């Protein structure tokens, strides 16, 4: 210490430092010492001065010219806080976007899955419908084989469609049973899986009867003598059906003449031919009735007697229709003759 600055000077010796004192700044005057009574209260204790313009109190400190206002620290937000808020908002936005995209993806996947399921169900339904249609067509074309059990006997019967339907029905099965086993349809009771087959027009496929199924038959067979008579009646029944087709053709031709489809100069000759054909048809029906009357059926031949009765009623109905056609032919002939006579006059 002695080497650096020499001997230490006492604090009270300030008179010698006059030349070293900092000079006063321009515009400032040295403070003059005033007694406390003249100074007044301190600045903090003085009443605030009112502003003439606004009427509000304003502080007097720093109001004098040249007075320095105290420096106020500005409230600044840290940059780190702003960056953290921005980062958080970005993270929230990204998470929301990710959630939305996931939800959209899930909804799209669910929609695609539902569409796939619907398309698969539709495809299955179409395939099942096609398979059912193919099965029905095959059954209609080739028929089906059914095992019919009667008492202690088993019969494998081949059933085909004979009623003009697209597939075999119960009536077709009953007819085959009557022809092969010998039990009349009126005495038959066909049972499949505990249910009686009563509706004759119901398709076999609708009842679940397929190729190889087993059907039980309950009913009494006819005697051999009655079977002979039944065959005769069936032959006569087929003949009646053929004659009935001829009668239907006659009726159509007569309707065409009545509606004027044939020239007038040919109508008279056509009516004469129709009249002869109708009379021949009537003779054919009468011959069938005579053949039916020649059949001798005992009282115990119940099925044969019932079948003969039904056949007689059918022939009588066709004979009545023949009479109607013959009357219409006569009326049309008379009308045509009267017209020609009027034209001749």
From Swiss-Prot:
Signal peptide: none annotated. Residues 216-345 are annotated as: Interaction with PPP1R15A. Isoform 4 is the most abundantly expressed isoform. It is ubiquitously expressed throughout most tissues, except the liver, colon, breast and uterine myometrium. Isoform 1 is expressed in the ovary and testis. Isoform 4 is expressed in several types of tumor cell lines, and at consistently high levels in leukemia and lymphoma cell lines. Isoform 1 is expressed in the prostate, breast and leukemia cell lines. Isoform 3 is the least abundant isoform in tumor cell lines (at protein level). One of its GO terms (molecular function) is protein-folding chaperone binding. Residues 81-91, 115-137 have a biased composition (Basic and acidic residues). The modification Phosphoserine is found at residue 223. Residues 95-114 have a biased composition (Low complexity). GO terms for cellular component: cytoplasm; cytosol; membrane; nucleoplasm; nucleus. Ubiquitinated; mediated by SIAH1 or SIAH2 and leading to its subsequent proteasomal degradation. Co-chaperone for HSP70 and HSC70 chaperone proteins. Acts as a nucleotide-exchange factor (NEF) promoting the release of ADP from the HSP70 and HSC70 proteins thereby triggering client/substrate protein release. Nucleotide release is mediated via its binding to the nucleotide-binding domain (NBD) of HSPA8/HSC70 where as the substrate release is mediated via its binding to the substrate-binding domain (SBD) of HSPA8/HSC70. Inhibits the pro-apoptotic function of PPP1R15A, and has anti-apoptotic activity. Markedly increases the anti-cell death function of BCL2 induced by various stimuli. PANTHER family: BAG FAMILY MOLECULAR CHAPERONE REGULATOR 1 (PTHR12329:SF16), BCL2-ASSOCIATED ATHANOGENE (PTHR12329). This is BAG family molecular chaperone regulator 1. The lineage of its organism: Eukaryota, Metazoa, Chordata, Craniata, Vertebrata.
